[in-house]
From Swiss-Prot:
There is a cross-link at K5 (Glycyl lysine isopeptide (Lys-Gly) (interchain with G-Cter in host protein DncV)). Keywords: Isopeptide bond. This is Uncharacterized 9.5 kDa protein in dexA-dda intergenic region. Cross-linked via an isopeptide bond to E.coli host protein DncV during infection. It comes from the Viruses.
Length: 81
C-alpha cells in the first residue's frame, strides 16, 4: 500500500506509542513485536533518507500490507487490554 511520507512518520509514532503502552502495562509479547516493527520502520526510514539524498524528494512510501496489519493488530491488543 502506498502512503504519503507524512503518513509514514505517523505510523512510526503509532508504533512507538504501542511500545510505550505495552511497556507501562508490562505486556512482554506486545513489546517484543512492536520493537520488531519499529526496527522494520527504521530500516524503511533509512532507505527513504538515502533515496531523498540521491534522487530528490520522495512523496510516497510503499508499506507491506502485513506490516500495516501487524500495527493494527498490536494496537487493538494493547488498547483493548
Amino acid at each position: 500500500m502506498e502512503i504519503t511520507k507524512d503518513q509514514f512518520y505517523l505510523l512510526q509514532d503509532k508504533v512507538s506509542e504501542i511500545y510505550e503502552i505495552a511497556y507501562s502495562k508490562n505486556r512482554e509479547t506486545v513489546k517484543i513485536e512492536s520493537s520488531k516493527l519499529m526496527l522494520q520502520l527504521e530500516e524503511i526510514e533509512r532507505d527513504l533518507i538515502a533515496l531523498e539524498f540521491f534522487c530528490g524528494e520522495v512523496k510516497t512510501v510503499t508499506i507491506n500490507d502485513y506490516v500495516l496489519g501487524e500495527i493494527s493488530y498490536l494496537y487493538e491488543a494493547i488498547i483493548n487490554d
